[in-house]
Amino acid sequence: WGTYIYNYGRPQGRNFLIANALFWAKEYHVDGLRMDAVASMLYLDYGKKNGEWVANMYGGNENLDAVAFFKQLNAVYKKKNRTSMLIAEESTAWPMVTGDIKDGSLGFDYKWNMGWMNDFLDFMSADPLFRKGRYGELTFSMIYAYSEDFILVISHDEVVHGKCSMINKMPEADISEKFADLRTAYGFMYTHPGKKLLFMGQDFGQFNEWWEKKSLDWDELSKEYNQKLHRYMKDLNVLYKKEPALYELDYNPEGFEWINNISADECIVSYVRRAKNGDELLVVVSFTPVLREKYKIGVPKAGHYKEIFNSNAKKYGGTGKLNSRVKVSQESECDNRKDSIYITIPPLGMCIFRHVDEETVTADEIEIPEIVDTKITKSENVPKAEKVKAKKKEMPGEINKETQKDSKIEKQKKKETQRETKKETQ
């Protein structure tokens, strides 16, 4: 930010910076250090015009001295502080920022996922009615999710200088929908692969932007919606720590599987998070203010599915429309899976299901599945039996049109037969 750049090729400069990092760990016992604007150090031409920088010995724009410095810093720091984290705020596609130095990486433990943050906040700031046009911003992050060890970050940078607090990024005018949308955003963030960083004040929905010259607006915790969001975040953190499926395989493709990432019109995503021991959680998230009942969704395996978390619970400020009964899957294809269940998806909501053993569920807890047409398509999302019932309600006392049509055809055939018989007789 207009400051001088260190000469990373000189031992005096490297020694000063490394000693500074070690001081924070030794004297202040910090849990970790974040390196700000790493890209400005890695590139010789960062923020410079043509003629203002000199290429490296290979003719490129990479700052080779800075690369060597990062490797030395991370190696020395980790040798003395094995449990302390080193995090890079790196906004470009520089390869191997995280990982083992022996493999050629810079040696950081984690990298801020700036791509996810920009895409996700852009998506969430859009009116829910138009989010389907930005649906790709929701799903794109999984294409590169395993290229680095990422942290999903909503930092101080996103809630200052006119960018609005998180609650005010939500576009709804209605206060209840605004908080519901924010709960959904955090629910998606916590179930998406990657570690989490959420800046202070955003956990209880502070309306004002953060300002370094004053404290947080703690008085807002006396308001109902802020209190309930605060409780939601507390319970979400408890759930996160309790469920290894949400964090154990963040950087392994085995830990995540899409169920449906193509429902742009409905703005719904569903996916599975998986633990090392094979335990699975089914996550369904809706980003529109539409209540969807009897919504058909494919499941990874047949059996019983119990809802263990729902952002729409009344204690969190929701309407209380939940999946209170255990869902039993049916052999009915959906989302390219042979088994499926019907669930209720709350408006602007996130729900999590666990596959449970039949022996652990009582008969009273189970929702008796309806007999449905196994050829039903995803777009219908309503059992055929239900459609027939609805049709009968709409037309009480009327004769079915198809039956009426068949009757007319039979009468016409009968008349033609009579004419032919009469001609033969004559």
PLM feature segments, named:
Residues 3, 172, 338:
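Short, flexible active-site loop motifs that bind/organize anionic cofactors or intermediates
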Residues 10-13, 17, 58, 62-66, ...:
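Residue-level preference for long, well-ordered alpha-helices that form the structural scaffold
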Residues 1-62, 343:
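Substrate-binding/active-site clefts of carbohydrate-active enzymes
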Residues 175-179, 188-198, 202-396, 401, ...:
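Carbohydrate-interacting/catalytic domains
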Residues 29-31, 46-212, 241-312, 319-320:
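Conserved alpha/beta catalytic core and glycan-binding cleft of carbohydrate-active enzymes
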Residues 13-24, 69, 73, 185, ...:
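Alpha-helical packing segments of well-folded alpha/beta enzyme cores
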